[in-house]
Amino acid sequence: TGQIAEGTLAYDYTVTFGAIKQGLLLYPGKAVGGIAVVAPLGAPWQKVLGDRDITVTIDSNLAEKLINYRIPMAHKGVNGNALIIGGSNDMIGAPILAAEAAVHSGAGKVTLGVPEVIKPVVQGRIIPEVMVTSTEAHKAMLEGRQVVAMGPGLGRTSDIPDFVDSILDSYEGPLVLDADALYALGHVGSVDKDALRDGEIESIYAVKQDLPYCVMTPHLGEFSRLIDLPIKWIERHYITLAREFAKAHQVILVLKGIPSIVALPDGTVYVNTIGNAGMGTGGMGDVLTGVIAGFI
C-alpha cells in the first residue's frame, strides 16, 4: 500500500526480490525506500504471481514503445477527427488547453464544442488549427467524430447532468471523461470498507450506475465522489480501488495522483514512475485530456 509504520527509517537502497513491490512505488513508502534494486528470485515473477492481476511500471522505454508514430504518407484525414466538449462562462481556458493539446498530440482534425454564449471569445483566443462549434446543436456536433473528450470547464449548473447524459446516449465511439463530466455522473459505485480493510477483493466494490466504455481521468477528489469514499481511504488502497473500479465498470481509469496510475478493464494496472512536482499546476489535467484524445 505504500503506508509506513511510525519510526520507519529512510534508506538509500532497497533490495527486493523477483519484481519491484507496489509499496516502493507509492508514497510515503517511495520516499523512504530510496533506489529499488530488483534481485533474482530463482523463477520468473509471472510464475510466482500465477493468475493474479499484475501491476506494471511505466518508464520512458515503455512509453516510447506505445507511441503511435505517423506513417510517411499520412494526412489530416487519416490522423483522426477529435471533438472536445467543455467551457462555461467562468471557465473558458480549460477547453482551449484541451483542444490545443489534442492538436499538438497528433489529431488530424480538432473541433471544440462550447456554449454559444462564449463561442466568440473562444474563437478569438484559440489557435487557428482548432474549429469552434456550438454545443446547442450537439447531435450535429457529434457526426463524424472518432473520439469525443468531455468535461474541461463544462461547469456544474443544474442542466449539465442532462447534457452529459445526452452526449453519452448519442455517441457510440471512444470517449474521454474528465472534470465536470465526471462530477455530473455523481456516485457510480460504492465501497465496502470492511471488505477493503480485510482484503476481501471480490466484495470490495459494487456498481450503482453503468458506464459506457471510456477513458476516465479523475484526480483523487473526483474519484472520491465517483465511489463515495473519503480520500484518506483511497490513499491507503490506491491501486486496489483503481483496479476494482476499472474491472467492475469495464473502463480505462487514469487516476491522477502521486503517482498517477492507469487501470485497465482486465485488471492490469500501470504505475507512472516519471511524473514530477512540476505537473502540479492549474490546467495540467485539461492538457492531459486533450493529449489522450489526440493519441486515441
Task: Map each language-model feature to its residues.
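Proline/glycine-rich low-complexity loops and linkers
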Residues: 1-3
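A conserved, positively charged/aromatic
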Residues: 7-9
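Small-residue (G/A/S/T)-rich helix-start motifs and N-terminal tracts that mark the onset
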Residues: 11-14, 19-179, 183-215, 220-296
